[in-house]
Amino acid sequence: MFALRTFAVLFASLSALAAATPLDARTNPTTTVTVTAPASTATVPAGQCNVSNQQCCNSVEKASSGPAALVLGLLGVVVQDVNVLVGLDCSPITVIGGGNGACNASPVCCENNSFGSLISIGCIPISL
């Protein structure tokens, strides 16, 4: 009988403790991104961009625009300069692989702030 009461008290105590534990800190981490490239709509030659940073993006927008802000929010990314350009749905521009360095969308040079091919932060348009 004593063991049953001890178990009941222990179970009730642990249940109350689990219910009082906040989940927000574990489930919603944020990432702050500081972009060193200025927000620019000027086009620069591809030769001024590191080859590994050249991207072909389906859309290039300011971080404050609707689609970009939505993706950044869902990823938990906070961009300090909301006027910085971000590329959405990007892929690397490479000569290897038969692409001949071509881009049928928006060629940009982005900092190494990317989240897969979903979004690249700190982009500047380039001319190929």
Curated annotation (Swiss-Prot):
InterPro entries reported for this sequence: Hydrophobin (IPR001338)
Record-linked SMART domains: HYDRO (SM00075)
Positions annotated with a glycan in the UniProt record: 50, 112
Signal sequence, renumbered to the chain: 1-20
Coiled coil stretches, renumbered: none
Subcellular location: Secreted; Secreted, Cell wall
KW Signal (keyword) present: yes
Disulfide-bond pairs as recorded: 49-109, 56-103, 57-90, 110-123
Keywords noted in UniProt: Cell wall, Disulfide bond, Glycoprotein, Secreted, Signal
Pfam families on file: Hydrophobin (PF01185)
Superkingdom per UniProt: Eukaryota
One GO MF term: structural constituent of cell wall
Residue spans crossing the bilayer: none
GO cellular component: extracellular region; fungal-type cell wall
Keyword Disulfide bond recorded: yes
Family, as annotated: Belongs to the fungal hydrophobin family.
Physiological role: Aerial growth, conidiation, and dispersal of filamentous fungi in the environment rely upon a capability of their secreting small amphipathic proteins called hydrophobins (HPBs) with low sequence identity. Class I can self-assemble into an outermost layer of rodlet bundles on aerial cell surfaces, conferring cellular hydrophobicity that supports fungal growth, development and dispersal; whereas Class II form highly ordered films at water-air interfaces through intermolecular interactions but contribute nothing to the rodlet structure.
Subunit structure: Self-assembles to form functional amyloid fibrils called rodlets. Self-assembly into fibrillar rodlets occurs spontaneously at hydrophobic:hydrophilic interfaces and the rodlets further associate laterally to form amphipathic monolayers.
Protein name according to UniProt: Class I hydrophobin 8
Gene: Hyd-8
